[in-house]
Amino acid sequence: MSHAQYDIAIIGGGPAGLSAAVQASKLGADVVLLDEQASPGGQIYRSIEQQSERQSELLGPDYQYGKLLVQNFRQSATQYLPESRVWSINDKREIGFTNPHGTHVIATKNIIIASGAMERPVPFVGWTLPGVMNAGAGQVLFKAQNVLPSEDVVLAGSGPLLLLLAWQYLS
């Protein structure tokens, strides 16, 4: 078990966590970012470093901002700990986590929890049938696997992610 001390520990590698890391690093803070994913970007910019130009065009102009954000993060002095799952935070500001390299504890003066948003689907009759998925699952299939529906799709619900998914499918 390792033990290190930081000025700021950030939990979450989506837009908020990356932005906080870049800014804090610019201001001279000793920053560590822990993220459960294998690459930075969170759900909204999932697999952004592996996207082709065509995929980026389909994902829209905000996606280009995500590429720039990840580039700035990679160039910052932030220590990046991908595939890290936090399992404890105590009153001494010690964070326990596991990753492929083992179990670790880090100490920090400040903690930023930027764990992102979570979809909350409403169950309905048939929602567990094959082919029925929420907007987040549709985004993951497209961003991580480059898979688009081959047949007509019915999108039901509300919210910005569903509208974005519809625009991406139509593009």
Please annotate each region the language model reported:
Residues 6-68, 148-171:
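Beta1-alpha1 glycine-rich phosphate/pyrophosphate-binding loop at the start
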Residues 1-11, 65-152:
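FAD-binding core/adjacent interface of flavoenzyme oxidoreductases
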